[in-house]
A protein has these predicted regions:
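Bacterial Sec-dependent N-terminal signal peptides
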Residues: 1-21
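Extracellular glycan-recognition regions
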Residues: 20-215
Length: 215
């Protein structure tokens, strides 16, 4: 009976996905202009907005648009991002957020005329890592995988081949707000579109190991 239960849990864990529609998500710092159409979210990003805490620049901001739902446990999330980036630091991508002192944002960021794969990890203070692209890209897929106390961040140009851009710590066993983030620290705003948003549940690794040992 225990072996049967373990097998069923494995099947459910692999196949399950969160039933989340864009309409049921919610805003933190709602922008003035946004629209949900054909299972995609488009917005005009609020000018002079960003997420950053203290380090290097000496200031803290927490006022950029973030459209999210809350998930617990382990999961994989991905989204396709298309943006009309114009000003320095224009950015868009995924965000995983526990609170104002603990979050990860990852995506495309426009810096000094170049497109960068950018990740900011914040625990009390923020750090920033970038991978500069050789040429502009019309769109990009960003994927995050939360396992135990770590989040792996990946990017792709075709939703087939994914390359890791960051592995970062994030407290486990606590719900996380997951969704679309866009910011415009220096400019007058820009248009961005998020589509093909998917969140897939992953079975808890520690629970599976316990079930395996106690089957």
């Amino acid at each position: 009976m225990k072996k049967l239960l373990f097998s069923l849990l494995m099947m459910i864990g692999v196949q399950a996905s969160f039933a989340q529609t864009l309409e049921k998500m919610q805003w933190f710092n709602e922008p003035e202009q946004w629209e949900i159409k054909d299972k995609s979210l488009s917005m005009f990003v609020t000018p002079q907005s960003d997420y950053w805490r203290i380090s290097h620049y000496g200031f803290t901001v927490d006022d950029a648009p973030f459209y999210y739902a809350t998930y617990g446990g382990e999961f994989e999330v991905k989204v396709k991002v298309t943006g009309d980036y114009k000003a320095r630091f224009d950015q868009a991508g995924l965000m995983l957020r526990i609170d104002h002192e603990n979050y990860i944002k990852a995506g495309i960021e426009f810096v000094d005329g170049k497109f960068n794969l950018s990740t900011v990890v914040t625990h009390k203070t923020s750090d920033w890592s970038v991978i500069t692209l050789d040429k502009p890209v019309p769109y990009i897929w960003i994927k995050a995988v939360r396992r135990l106390d770590a989040v792996e961040i990946f990017y792709s140009f075709d939703d087939k081949t994914y390359t890791m851009m960051r592995n970062a710590w994030l407290q486990d066993n606590i719900p996380v707000k997951v969704g679309f983030m866009a910011a415009c620290p220096d400019g007058g705003g820009f248009n961005v579109k998020f589509e093909n948003f998917k969140v897939k549940h992953l079975p808890d690794m520690r629970r599976l190991e316990w079930l395996k040992k106690n089957a």
